[in-house]
Amino acid sequence: MPKATRGVLIECDPSIKALIVNIDSSQHNIILDELDDTHLMIHPSMVEVVKQKLNKMLAENTYNPNEEAAKATGK
């Protein structure tokens, strides 16, 4: 008999998908299924966790010229 699992369909760029897979690699409770290069099925209760972790990762890896100028002037 078929088994159905409730999930949330996520459509994203392959680079963002790689970040989500990286997040899931430490916990293994986020991704229910990798559908293709741009689609994932994730656990409904983990949507906010994924958003928070992605925002944190993207903020850490975003170049901010104002921040570099402040470091250069010693502020």
Swiss-Prot record:
Cellular compartments per GO CC: cytosol; transcription factor TFIIH core complex; transcription factor TFIIH holo complex
Name the keywords, alphabetized.
Answer: DNA damage, DNA repair, Nucleus, Transcription, Transcription regulation
> Keyword Transcription, does the record have it?
yes
Which GO BP terms apply?
A: nucleotide-excision repair, preincision complex assembly; transcription by RNA polymerase II; transcription initiation at RNA polymerase II promoter
According to its UniProt record, where is this protein mainly located?
nucleus
State the InterPro entries in the record: TFB5-like_sf, TFIIH_TTDA/Tfb5
The superkingdom of the source organism is: Eukaryota
Pfam families per the record? Tfb5
Q: Where in the cell is it found?
A: Nucleus
The answer on whether this UniProt entry bears the keyword Hydrolase reads: no
Please give the function described in this protein's UniProt entry: Component of the general transcription and DNA repair factor IIH (TFIIH) core complex, which is involved in general and transcription-coupled nucleotide excision repair (NER) of damaged DNA and, when complexed to TFIIK, in RNA transcription by RNA polymerase II. In NER, TFIIH acts by opening DNA around the lesion to allow the excision of the damaged oligonucleotide and its replacement by a new DNA fragment. In transcription, TFIIH has an essential role in transcription initiation.
Question: What does the similarity note say?
Answer: Belongs to the TFB5 family.
What quaternary structure, including any partners, is listed in this protein's UniProt entry?
A: Component of the 7-subunit TFIIH core complex composed of XPB/SSL2, XPD/RAD3, SSL1, TFB1, TFB2, TFB4 and TFB5, which is active in NER. The core complex associates with the 3-subunit CTD-kinase module TFIIK composed of CCL1, KIN28 and TFB3 to form the 10-subunit holoenzyme (holo-TFIIH) active in transcription.
Q: What's the protein name?
A: General transcription and DNA repair factor IIH subunit TFB5
